[in-house]
């Protein structure tokens, strides 16, 4: 395969990334069609995927995607929550059309739908979860590229990239590596400079899934740090004794209860009027 070429050989750095994100760990079940990609079975059950064959299939998938003249004709689909962030980043960097979340039935076959699309290539994260998209692609003759685990069925899948497609970090790394290889084949980046776009290095963790609760905690902590960093300005003390002028004694102005009051006249002593 092309993975043996010197310019596209699997580097030690990429191997370390695959091992760090556990992209080589498959499930405990094994499909007979995936047996050719399994290196060995671990003592506690999981199947170990051969990372060399993963790399070869990844390069084949990247060449198929890069061969599409219009990048928007490549539709990427994933209903798995862990892959949706990676899906959006992949579409933004490669120009593909992203469909994340629930795949509407008839999106590829029903022409009267508003979401109807006519792709030339379909890329998915899991053939089990995205089975509706795979079925409709087979009806209209659209090739399908998928990340597959050791238990995934390869029926209706044209190119399967063996990897751990259920891990939060592993699926993000696979989308990142696929986007990098596509951009290298298109000539937008080089293998020597790395994954650098517009002067910014695109790291693999940009494609990783982020828990909304953890993001909220980080934002809350950042606001608390900003509030503590702001200095509290205490009000200036004013010394009233230094001001000029005489200070009146308010107590002297209050009326006392012992003050003399005007006596009222008694009505009985008033003279009576005899002449009506």
From Swiss-Prot:
InterPro entries attached here? Answer: Ribosomal_uS2, Ribosomal_uS2_CS, Ribosomal_uS2_euk, Ribosomal_uS2_euk/arc, Ribosomal_uS2_flav_dom_sf
One GO molecular-function entry: structural constituent of ribosome
Q: Name one GO cellular component term.
A: cytosolic small ribosomal subunit
Example GO BP:
ribosomal small subunit assembly
This protein's record includes keyword Ribosomal protein? yes
N-acetylserine, modified sites: 2
**UniProt keyword annotations, A-Z:** Acetylation, Cytoplasm, Ribonucleoprotein, Ribosomal protein
- The organism's superkingdom is given as Eukaryota
Q: Where in the cell is it found?
A: Cytoplasm
Q: Entry's HAMAP family?
A: Ribosomal_S2_euk
- Could you give the subunit structure recorded for this chain? Component of the small ribosomal subunit. Mature ribosomes consist of a small (40S) and a large (60S) subunit. The 40S subunit contains about 33 different proteins and 1 molecule of RNA (18S). The 60S subunit contains about 49 different proteins and 3 molecules of RNA (28S, 5.8S and 5S). Interacts with rps-21.
Q: Which family does it belong to?
A: Belongs to the universal ribosomal protein uS2 family.
What this protein is reported to do is described as: Required for the assembly and/or stability of the 40S ribosomal subunit. Required for the processing of the 20S rRNA-precursor to mature 18S rRNA in a late step of the maturation of 40S ribosomal subunits. Involved in cold-warm shock-induced translocation of the RNA exosome components from the nucleolus to nucleoplasm.
> What is the official name of this protein in its record?
Small ribosomal subunit protein uS2
Q: What organism is listed for this UniProt entry? A: Caenorhabditis elegans
